[in-house]
Amino acid sequence: MIKKIESLEILPPKNQLELFGYENYFNSFVKLYKKNKLPNTMLLSGPKGSGKATFAYHFINYILSDKKINKYSIENMTINPQSLSYKSLLNNTNPNFSLLENDTVGENIKIDKVRDMLNFLNKSTYSSDIKIILIDNAEYLNIYSSNALLKVLEESKNKTFFFIIHNSHSKILDTIRSRC
């Protein structure tokens, strides 16, 4: 029997508590992470609204809630809304996480944002040595931002992870694509 959905509420990716359709990818990422073989830079490509950012937020939540109470449920692909890592990601207050995105839809991501990210990377964290950067709408990086990001990607440390999300493959510099 098909379940009828009475009302569907569309939430921003970081507010989505359940992950649908990415189970195999998620489990593959978890295996790589547990074996310390997860790449430092991951490029998530696809059409807008396909779940790339939701996937990234779920995996970031998994990493940041690792070994803590109220941790991420791999079996159900769900975020515990009581989890400190979820609450701090939701409020953008997690000291191990930085979000890089354009301020206004359709505007370029300026080099100042990349410099802010660099400052974040140079600060120490209080709870772990992991740093996670989510770059959303990466196709809006201008040439200066892209080149600054490229330098950061080349010099990234072992426990620093970049999730680069974009909707238009052709607008990403080949040199950035080659680092992912």
Residue ranges and their predicted role:
Residues 96, 159, 178-179:
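Short acidic capping loops at alpha-helix termini that bridge into adjacent secondary structure
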Residues 122, 147-164:
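Conserved catalytic/switch belt of AAA+ P-loop NTPases
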Residues 1-144:
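Clamp-loader machinery-focused feature within the broader ASCE/P-loop NTPase space
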Residues 164, 168-170:
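Short glycine/proline-centered loop/turn elements that form peptide/ligand docking sites
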